[in-house]
Every structure is written in C-alpha cells, then in structure tokens.
Amino acid sequence: WTTASIMSGALIERVRLSAYLLLAVLLGSAVWIMDAAWGWSGAGWLTTRFGFHDSIASAVVHGVAGAFTLGVLLNLGPRIGKFDMAGRARTFRAHNTHLTLMGLMLIFTGFYAFYGACLVIQSIAFPGWLNIYLSPTTLGAIAIVITFGFAGGFTGGWFASKGDPFWTLSGGLAGVISVSAGADVYHPSLAYLLSISGGMLAVYAGVWIERTLRIDDAVGAVAVHGVCGFYGVFLVGIFAGGFPTGLNNVPSSFGGQLMGMMAFLPLGFLSGYVASWLLKKANLLRVPPEVELEGLDMAEFQQDFFPEFERVPETVVLPDGEEVESAPVLLEGFAQVTNGHRPGVRVEVGGEEGRR
C-alpha cells in the first residue's frame, strides 16, 4: 500500500479512480513483490551475488514507486491549465496549506513505524537478532536516524526552495528517504549531512521535472521518492561500502548498488508506462475534460471537498509570478484541450461558473 500511496498524489485531479486502482494493484501486488524478492530479501539474487544494500527500502519501495509513477505520468499528461501555450509551468495553489502541511507531518510520524516494520525482514535473514517487537536499542537506532534524516532534509529543502513551505517539508521526507538505504550503518551525523543533500536534490529535481521535462507531478512524488530513493542506494556505495549483506555476507560495493539501480529502474518505469499506455488506448486512464474541470468530487459524488465552508475563488501563479484567479486560466486550457468542440458544457471553477 505504501508504493500505491506514493503514486496516488502525483496523479490527482485527472486520473480515473478505476484506472488508479488497477495500477495500484499492479504496483503493490506484483512489481513491488518482485523487486523486494530481488534486493530486500536476504536470499535475493542482488544481495547474495552483488551485495546490494538497501536496509530500509530507499529504492525497493520509494525508488521503484517513483519510477512507476513517472511512466504513468508520461501517458496521463498534465492537468488542464498547468502549462501555457509556450510550455511554461503554472503553479496551482493548495486549497488549504494547513492541511497540506499536517498531512506531511502525519507521514513523518508514520515513518517511525515504517522503519520498525522494515527490520522484520532482517529478523528472517538473521534469526535471533531481532523480533517483531524490536528492542529498546533497535528502537533508539531507528528513531535517531529518522530524526536526523528529517532535520537534514528540512534544512536542505528550506535552503534550496528559499523557504517554500511545501518543499521545505517535502525536503524532510526526501532527506529521510535518502539515508534509508544505509540507515543501519550510518552514524547520525553522517545521516544528517547526507539528508541535507537529499532535501536539496528533491527541490532541484522537482523543478527540473516540471519546467524542463514538462511533466505535471502534482506533489513531487517522482522527485522526492523516485530520485531520492535511487540517490539513497547510490550513497551507500560511496559511504558504506564493505559492510556484509545478505545470507552470504557479500560486502556492499558501489558496483553492487549500481547493479540494483539498473535492475529496479526499468522494472518500475516500464511496468508503469506499459500498463498506463494500455489503459490510455482503451480510453480508461483519464477522466473527460469537463469532469476534470468540474472536479472529481463534484462530478462523481456531487459533494464538495469542504461542504461546511463556502467555496472561494481559487488562484494560480503564472510563470512570471503573477497570481490570478484560476477560472479564466482553466477555461482557456479547457478550450485548448477540447478544441472548442464541447459547447454548452457547464463547469464551476473556484466558485465561478462559466459556459463553453
């Protein structure tokens, strides 16, 4: 379910629920199972032959899910109005920044349990070392690495984004993902320094993916999880080489980490791309433009996301930095997508009604 939840945020506002559920089943029940057997199991071929080291699933969970998501996004396409006629990206403001930041904080607290669950695989590979209840020493090691990873990620995200709230907190998430692969061997001070670079990398990668590749990743999942997930196993090859890994105690190495990256990247990306391409050809991947513009909550459930509050006009930030109401921008994008061939479609955007 973790891999599927990573994908969900990137696809919001335009993917069909049925298509997402099919992709989630494929990613969480097939692709992830395969890569976990290869590089996370103590008897996996990547660990026993090449010493691939990914203790808390930087690439096994986050990297593969990010690569899968990238493949889906290429077929799904951007949201209406995300890019102008020149291909420059616009920024959609969050409808509630407080809830956005609260959600990120809930993810942070969940990581403490997620790390503990990841260690169960080591109790299978090395019987008697750990148990499902863990121990005070193990819990302390988990907590300190996670905490330092978040702290460093916050620092890097804050500097790279110049204090942007979303990217500052996302940088904390990217930081802990960047040190997850070597969390069992890193010194806390090293984890802090490496996570700073991970937080900064997520911001730069997110901007590059949006502005250069023109891919609309609504929450930066590819940058935070995909890029930083593979960055995490890359760092192990540099800063944690020589540690015994797997049942055969093969030492970890830079080459072994690259081998794991070369196995996981195409596994995730090609699976997501091919599956979403088939759904696209069957016209099952994306909702119709008028449904996207109205909003999936309103179209499917006739229910606004905050029914207890009056809806206010939403805003969008243009490429030149000017903030304007989103309704005219989205209606213009809707006309471009439909080529003006859908007269009489009634839409409501940000509290404003219009007809095309």
PLM regions: where:
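Hydrophobic alpha-helical transmembrane bundles of multi-pass membrane proteins
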Residues: W1-R356
